[in-house]
Amino acid sequence: MKYWIFKYPFILKLFLNLFPPLFFSGIKITYISQDFHRFQIKLRNWPGTRNANGSQFGGSLFSMSDAVYGTILMAILGDKYYVWDKKSVINFKHPGFGAVYLEGVITPLFIREIIEHTKNGEKYFPTVFATVHDKKGNEIATVSRTLYVRLKLSLIHITEPTRQ
């Protein structure tokens, strides 16, 4: 991936909003903070995202967090790390009628834990949690995503013991 995309939040936001899987699903990134640690996502209400009951399609709700957490984490960590989605779980609480929202936060402590667990090239599988809510604040679903994070092997400094 071209790392100039991660240089400024507005460039990443534009890139994600034009990314076909999100764009054609009615998903829009509405905000990314200057330090990339906070972001907001909106799933618009239109016929392409509604199910037979008129509420938001579960797959669209699930897609709100897909690719975004990993991509935001890549922006924070830089090009020294591999970041992929490994596993994801959604728990539907209530039907979502109308536009729904997800607000994500990646804390400095979370980043420090990743750096500590991966400093020698180990794989690390942190989990992030998010809540999807409607405009009244009602909880529609909760999502957990387990990520795969690893320092790129070419950047690991392995020291060989000296022989005497």
Language model regions located:
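HotDog/MaoC-like acyl-thioester-processing domains
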Residues: 1-6, 97, 107-154
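A generic structural signal for short beta-strands and their flanking turns/coil linkers
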Residues: 25, 37-39, 84-88, 98-102, ...
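Hydrophobic beta-strand-centered segment that forms part of the acyl-chain substrate-binding groove
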Residues: 72-109
